[in-house]
Structure formats: C-alpha cells, structure tokens
C-alpha cells in the first residue's frame, strides 16, 4: 500500500531505479556496437538478461531494442505520473566511441542503415519531463 503523501521524492526514487537498471546495460550495448559496428537488436544479442529478468521494486522490465535501452515502470506501487511509463537511454557514435543520452522513450528503426544513430520519439508511455531527473531530459534530437 502506498503512503498517502506522494511527494516528488517518491517519483524520483522510481525514476532513479529505472535509470540505474538501464545504465547497467550500457557497457554491454557499447561493447556490442564497438565489436560489430551496429547496435544490438535485443537483450540476447547484447548479452544481457531478458527484459523480464531486469526488474526492480518500481521497474517492470528493461528492454534493449536496436541499441536503445528502455525501462518500463510498474503499473502498480508507483506514483500515477509514472505508472507504466518509460524512459530510454541511447547512444550515438562520437570520435570512435559512443556518447550516451537519457530521456523520454525513443526508438531506433534500422540498426544496419547508414543513419543507424538516428532515433525518434516513441510516442506512447512517456514520463513527463517535469517528472524526470534533470540528468535525464535529453530529446531524440540530442547531440
């Protein structure tokens, strides 16, 4: 049962967990990209646990799809503002390595295309920017 008062601290606690769990997949995604020249298609190709096994108190799952790491919040036990909502971590090539971003959910359609760094907004299930930590407010156009 949730406490009656739900301040911003409790919202951020769920987001912090989502970011920590998603960040735990970054090194595997980066390593895959640097070794193969393309983003991993899914959790298996990235060499991480299945989405349903990367969970937490507030996080339902963490999915790797075309190199984008997306955490989905639980639909219960969290504030209504983030119930079932998502945030993403994604990277772009930069000087022989990769630069990571964090923000509202994005998707990458084609991992083998020349523009395989491009991501676009994933329209559904966004956590409103005001409920995201200041360190996780990048947009799909971030560089």
What do the PLM-derived regions correspond to, one by one?
Residues 34-143:
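Periplasmic/extracellular, small/polar-rich flexible segments of pilin-like filament-forming proteins
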């Amino acid at each position: 049962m949730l406490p009656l008062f739900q301040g911003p601290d409790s919202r951020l606690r769920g987001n912090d967990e989502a970011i920590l769990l998603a960040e735990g997949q970054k090194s595997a995604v980066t390593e895959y990209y640097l070794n193969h020249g393309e983003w991993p298609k899914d959790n298996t190709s990235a060499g991480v646990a299945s989405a349903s096994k990367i969970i937490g108190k507030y996080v339902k799952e963490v999915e790797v799809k075309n190199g984008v790491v997306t955490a989905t919040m639980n639909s219960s036990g969290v504030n209504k503002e983030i119930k079932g909502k998502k945030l993403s971590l994604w990277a772009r090539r930069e000087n022989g390595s990769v630069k990571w971003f964090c923000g509202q959910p994005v998707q990458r359609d084609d991992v083998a295309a020349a523009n395989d760094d491009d991501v676009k907004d994933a329209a559904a299930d966004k956590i409103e920017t005001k409920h995201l930590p200041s360190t996780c407010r990048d947009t799909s156009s971030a560089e």
